[in-house]
């Protein structure tokens, strides 16, 4: 995998190919970017899960991804680079699977199965890159890092699971599982983008995802975007945080392995839970509290390892 650094500000993160002492600085910075990514995903998920109850999931998906296109179009102007054709292809494939994943997850939310959709998608999306990094890429995390990865996956399940009555269980479970597979594949494709590629592959990623969502929205309903102004604005805000998460994730990959960054960036359920308690007055279950603590410990172990 080509991972070289460039001279622009956003490309000034050290490459994986530099000396060992340089990597000692890189990895903590990588974890910081991964944590910023998980906060961004959590905020995006918080806004999107709420609006998906009131608006059509297809229309919410289109708006979320439209926001990503708009933000990346501006960002790419200032984030120059030297992308190869392979970088652009990986960006396009990341967009295709990401668009499908967002659509399926929002459909699961719309069916009222948030309690099982959120933990299922979160666990799968973090597990797929870990298996890929270890089994395919041959990565060998340290014992401390491996402990953090395992604890992180368990923490994801605990913090995102909600008690209470389950509705539309099996259908939501299947949709969330497939969505998690697509999100995991998105992480893998993003990891193949070179450090000096700049922002254009991520712009292509968002355009491809938007085209998928827009096509589905137009073929299944009369509108491409939510009919209410509130629904559109909320979805757009979710999209801004969503693309921020992608950018932070790619930056995190420059100093850490795919397995480590994916698990650290997948702790977004903790953010969603805290926002739900603070803003919506939702109840925090005791196991979610354990999950929040586990998430913090997992990130700490990954950083130390």
Give a label for each model feature.
Residues 2, 6, 10-43, 47-93, ...:
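Membrane-interface interhelical linkers
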Residues 35, 39, 66, 92-96, ...:
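Residue-level signature of the transmembrane alpha-helical core
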Residues 42, 46, 73, 95-103, ...:
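Hydrophobic/small/kink-forming positions within alpha-helical transmembrane segments
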Residues 67-72, 127-132, 143-161, 287-304:
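Hydrophobic transmembrane alpha-helices of multi-pass small-molecule transport proteins
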Residues 72-81, 129-144, 182-199, 242-258, ...:
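Hydrophobic alpha-helical transmembrane segments in multi-pass integral membrane proteins
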Residues 93-99, 106-156, 202-208, 258-278:
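Specific alpha-helical transmembrane segments that line the substrate/conduction pathway
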Residues 125, 155, 172-189, 212, ...:
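Alpha-helical transmembrane segments of multi-pass integral membrane proteins
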């Amino acid at each position: 995998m080509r991972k070289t650094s460039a001279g622009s500000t956003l490309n000034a993160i050290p490459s994986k190919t530099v000396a060992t002492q340089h990597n000692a600085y890189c990895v903590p910075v990588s974890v910081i970017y991964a944590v910023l990514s998980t906060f961004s995903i959590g905020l995006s998920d918080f806004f999107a899960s709420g609006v998906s109850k009131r608006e059509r999931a297809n229309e919410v998906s289109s708006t979320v991804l439209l926001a990503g296109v708009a933000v990346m179009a501006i960002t790419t102007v200032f984030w120059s680079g030297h992308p190869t054709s392979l970088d652009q292809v990986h960006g396009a494939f990341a967009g295709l699977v990401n668009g499908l994943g967002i659509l399926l997850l929002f459909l699961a939310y719309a069916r009222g199965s948030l309690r099982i959709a959120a933990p299922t998608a979160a666990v799968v999306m973090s597990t797929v890159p870990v298996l890929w990094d270890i089994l395919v890429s041959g990565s060998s995390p340290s014992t401390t890092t491996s402990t953090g990865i395992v604890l992180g996956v368990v923490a994801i399940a605990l913090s995102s699971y909600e008690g209470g009555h389950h509705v539309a269980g099996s259908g939501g479970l299947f949709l969330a599982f497939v969505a998690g597979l697509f999100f995991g594949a998105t992480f893998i494709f993003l990891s193949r983008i070179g450090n000096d590629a700049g922002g254009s592959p991520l712009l292509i990623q968002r355009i491809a995802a938007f085209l998928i969502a827009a096509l589905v929205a137009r073929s299944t309903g009369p509108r491409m975007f939510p009919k209410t102004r509130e629904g559109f604005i909320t979805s757009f805000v979710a999209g801004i945080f969503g693309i921020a998460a992608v950018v932070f994730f790619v930056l995190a990959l420059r100093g850490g392995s795919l397995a480590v960054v994916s698990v650290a960036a997948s702790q977004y359920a903790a953010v969603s839970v805290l926002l739900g308690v603070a803003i919506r007055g939702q109840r925090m279950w005791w196991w979610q509290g354990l999950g929040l603590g586990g998430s913090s410990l997992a990130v700490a172990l990954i950083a130390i390892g």
